[in-house]
């Protein structure tokens, strides 16, 4: 029997849409802070660039999933790409740091709407027997965008300035809009109106797991370089992030269908275990061998955890609610990053860098515990339903 095709035209378009959106976001994330500082902006304003876009995206993602259930992906994407294009066209007209901070809300809106809707459509359009593989490939596009966006933005900025960065971003936005216009997707969703619901209750246990596991994610960017500097480690840590990204990309390429074959839980538990161990290693005074081991473990854990958990949620959610469930899980990823940056930052400031990474490890361990307990309850419920 021939295996069902994985990369259909619809899924290919979703990969291109999500990849394009993330290239735009990462390109601007790498260059706007430099431009804002050059205009005399403060560090607080630089921080607000990211806080504004992340907060807007986090609020929208759970809602977007429900809208896709009700209206269909394409009808949800169209206003999202309109906001994105309008924002990209307004960026060259911004007069100062405060204007750029305000416009980041538009980028957060575009990212939250388009990336979430594209992910829901991938889950809807992929064969059930290869859903884990399809979602791993989808999130591979995000990892590749992270590898491409910042270098592209910095290269253009160095050679031609911020206005050229805006032009490149607007060009990519136009391509994204064209892809959405020709996207073949159901015109309407299947879910009836259920009133305003910001989150899906079925997805809450998985969402709580994501929040816990993601508590330490921002710390590897915010505090690891400072920890290395304070510990006397010489040289740039750029290699750490390159190795980390390579492990994510390699993991999603080589292990993309693993959970379809052996089961979701058998992939999720080792993935979160590796994540926990990586933070414990990072809590030690930074040395090159330990940092390399941590990058490999964390990259492998990140590669497999979220796509597999998302596939598990989709497996267990009625078709009419899958968009809402996926949106809830997607929003929890941003929530974990926001809460984690505050919690780990407070711990680092009041105690030490090591304590901050131990906090990240405790969060990941709490997520692992929550997942295992939830899975046991699901197993008990299934046995009782079957009368076993």
Regions found by a protein language model. Name each.
Residues 98-104, 206, 290-295:
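Short hydrophobic/alpha-helical segments at membrane-entry points of transmembrane helices
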Residues 75-89, 170, 266-280:
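Structural signature of the two symmetry-related core transmembrane helices
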Residues 105-140:
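Cytoplasmic helix-loop-helix junction between adjacent transmembrane helices
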Residues 170-189, 370-375:
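C-terminal membrane-cytosol helix-exit motif in multi-pass small-molecule transporters
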């Amino acid at each position: 029997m021939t295996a069902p095709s994985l990369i259909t035209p619809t899924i290919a378009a979703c990969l291109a849409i999500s990849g394009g959106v993330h290239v735009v976001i990462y390109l601007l994330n790498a260059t706007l802070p430099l431009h804002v500082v050059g205009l005399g902006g403060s560090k607080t304003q630089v921080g607000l660039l990211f806080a504004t876009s992340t907060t807007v995206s986090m609020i929208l993602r759970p809602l977007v999933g429900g809208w896709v259930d009700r209206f269909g992906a394409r009808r949800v994407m169209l206003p999202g790409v309109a906001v994105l294009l309008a924002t990209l066209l307004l960026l060259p007209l911004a007069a100062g740091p405060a204007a750029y901070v305000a416009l980041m809300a538009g980028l957060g809106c575009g990212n939250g709407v388009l990336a979430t809707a594209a992910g829901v459509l991938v889950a809807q359009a992929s064969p059930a027997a290869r859903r884990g593989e399809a979602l791993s490939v989808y999130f591979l596009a995000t990892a590749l965008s992270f590898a491409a966006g910042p270098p592209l933005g910095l290269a253009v900025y160095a050679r031609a300035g911020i206005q050229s960065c805006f032009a490149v971003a607007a060009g990519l936005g136009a391509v994204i809009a064209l892809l959405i216009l020709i996207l073949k997707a159901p015109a309407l969703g299947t879910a009836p109106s259920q009133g305003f619901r910001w989150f899906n209750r079925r997805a809450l246990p998985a969402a709580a797991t994501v929040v816990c596991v993601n508590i330490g994610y921002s710390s590897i960017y915010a505090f690891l370089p400072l920890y290395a500097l304070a510990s006397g480690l010489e040289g740039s840590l750029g290699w750490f992030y390159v190795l980390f990204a390579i492990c994510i990309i390699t993991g999603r390429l080589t292990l993309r269908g693993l959970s379809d074959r052996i089961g979701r839980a058998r992939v999720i538990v080792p993935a979160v275990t590796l994540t926990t161990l990586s933070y414990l290693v990072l809590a030690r005074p930074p040395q090159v061998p330990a940092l390399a081991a941590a990058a490999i473990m964390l990259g492998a854990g990140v590669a497999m955890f979220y796509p597999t958990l998302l596939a598990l949620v989709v497996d267990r959610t009625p078709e009419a609610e899958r968009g809402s469930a996926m949106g809830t899980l997607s929003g929890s990823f941003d929530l974990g990053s926001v809460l984690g940056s505050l919690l780990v930052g407070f711990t680092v400031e009041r105690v030490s860098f090591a304590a901050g990474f131990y906090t990240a490890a405790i969060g990941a361990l709490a997520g692992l515990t929550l997942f295992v307990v939830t899975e046991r309850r699901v197993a008990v419920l299934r046995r009782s339903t079957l009368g076993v």
